[in-house]
């Protein structure tokens, strides 16, 4: 697959310091190298230190300022190998903010300097995240380098929708037509632009669709007509850049619930990706809603289960179960086994069990990750530490569950598997032509 997100040539930002070491008459130049120095936010870079003494103990520090103007930092200590080198993709730190060999461990293990910061905020407007790294020897920085993470590949086109649909279509910078993905968010509302940018960077025409808490759309997730999403699918199928018979839907949390529901209703959808989903329709959310139901069809409310925080009601769950077996294509569900918002692994298992019982014609898979929470599988390599996060719709604080290492490992594993699922389900993306 040709990688359009990586610059044509590999650039190394290296600041080298020449110091005397290892004995009289022997000069070493300490360098810190990042290869490549510019990556898409779902890609790894290799961080290497060279010019050290064999078996020398050194540290590497990393720092960034996020989209909320908050400083994050990490550090790890390593023992140089017999050639006087350290490679973070091959060597585990002996001490530091993470404890396993990980090319991007210094990035995902960062923590905020302000203890009141709840979570990492990405750069505004799909901007570039700059990360500064420093090689420290005997307490003194001797070399530095920078890593740039791109929120979207160069040349991706953004087309803002007008009229009754609210969203942005992102098109790859390769020859059309492309498979399409309808991308929907969860209870946070707004437009899921970052996930759509990821897909467009990987060769898919991605429509980031808002359905509440955006412009003049409803303020809360309540009484949302599912015909709205049918209109979005019809719009996508009419676009000359999109292959109409190769469209998937992708959603997260309440959006994962919605993705499964839409897949069961619209035969135009040929694949479903649901991150931390529910297997049942849940009630309206999140605040003082006017009606108890989240979704309508042909003007009528769809049955919903009791709120997950109030315990389970099996009779209501039976009526509200999403008929995933009616989907006209493969299904991929992703869950965190330590999800603090709701039991996404149990509910994703219920999806798989229903497909198995109904002898579902198409393939299906459940990626479940231990020690990952409600952000399991997120397609970006960023600082994963978080505290209690405030839901922008309800204003309530939520415990997302998981830990930094578990969430990071889920992302590192799921990124390639989701792209492979889409490739198999929809055919080659635009980046693979």
Predicted regions and their residues:
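N-terminal cap/lid segment of alpha/beta-hydrolase-fold proteins
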Residues: 33-40, 45-57, 69-74, 79-81, ...
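Short, aromatic- and glycine-rich surface loops/edge beta-strands on solvent-exposed regions
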Residues: 100, 105, 114-138
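Cap/lid segment of the alpha/beta-hydrolase catalytic domain
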Residues: 164-165, 176-238, 245, 283-287, ...
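Short beta-strand-to-loop junctions in surface cap/lid or active-site-entrance loops
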Residues: 166-177, 185-187, 320-324, 424
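Primarily recognizes the serine-hydrolase "nucleophile elbow" in alpha/beta-hydrolase
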Residues: 189-194, 230-317, 342-346
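Short beta-strand/loop motif that positions the catalytic acidic residue
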Residues: 327, 333-335, 339
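Acidic catalytic loop of the alpha/beta-hydrolase fold
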Residues: 338-342, 373-375
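C-terminal catalytic histidine-bearing segment of alpha/beta-hydrolase fold enzymes
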Residues: 349, 357-433
């Amino acid at each position: 697959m040709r990688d359009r997100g990586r610059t044509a040539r590999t650039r190394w930002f290296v600041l080298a310091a020449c110091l005397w070491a290892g004995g009289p008459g022997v000069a070493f130049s300490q360098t810190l190298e990042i290869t490549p120095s510019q990556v898409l936010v779902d890609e790894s870079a290799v961080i290497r230190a060279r010019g050290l003494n064999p078996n020398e103990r050194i540290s590497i520090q990393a720092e960034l300022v996020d989209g909320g103007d908050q400083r994050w930092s990490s550090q790890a200590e390593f023992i140089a190998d017999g050639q006087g080198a350290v490679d973070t993709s091959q060597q585990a730190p002996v001490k530091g903010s993470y404890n396993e060999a990980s090319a991007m461990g210094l990035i995902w293990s960062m923590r905020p300097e302000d203890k009141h910061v709840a979570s990492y905020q990405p750069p505004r407007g799909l901007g570039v995240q700059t990360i500064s790294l420093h090689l420290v020897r005997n307490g003194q920085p001797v070399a530095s380098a920078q890593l740039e993470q791109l929120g979207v590949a160069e040349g991706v086109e953004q087309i803002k929708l007008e009229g009754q649909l609210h969203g942005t279509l992102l098109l790859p910078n390769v020859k059309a037509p492309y498979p399409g993905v309808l991308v929907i968010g969860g209870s946070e509302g707004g437009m899921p632009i970052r996930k759509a940018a990821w897909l467009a960077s990987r060769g898919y025409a991605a429509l980031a669709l808002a359905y509440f808490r955006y412009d003049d759309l409803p303020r809360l997730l309540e009484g949302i007509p599912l015909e709205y999403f049918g209109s979005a699918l019809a719009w996508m199928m009419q676009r000359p850049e999109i292959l109409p018979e190769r469209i998937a839907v992708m959603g997260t949390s309440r959006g994962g619930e919605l993705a499964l529901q839409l897949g069961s209703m619209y035969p135009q959808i040929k694949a479903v990706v649901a991150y931390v989903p529910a297997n049942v329709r849940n009630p309206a959310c999140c605040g003082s809603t006017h009606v108890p139901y989240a979704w309508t069809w042909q003007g009528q409310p769809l049955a919903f289960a009791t709120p997950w925080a109030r315990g389970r009601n099996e009779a209501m769950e039976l009526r509200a179960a999403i008929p995933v077996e009616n989907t006209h294509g493969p299904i991929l569900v992703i869950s965190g086994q330590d999800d603090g918002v709701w039991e996404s692994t149990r509910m994703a298992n219920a999806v798989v069990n229903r497909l198995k019982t109904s002898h579902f014609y198409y393939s299906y898979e459940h990626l479940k990750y231990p020690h990952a929470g409600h952000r399991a599988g997120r397609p970006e390599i960023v600082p994963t530490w978080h505290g209690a996060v405030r839901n922008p719709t309800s204003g309530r604080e939520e415990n997302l569950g998981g830990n930094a290492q578990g969430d990071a490992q889920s992302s590192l594993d799921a990124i390639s598997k989701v792209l492979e699922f889409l490739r198999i389900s929809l055919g080659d993306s635009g980046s693979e032509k």
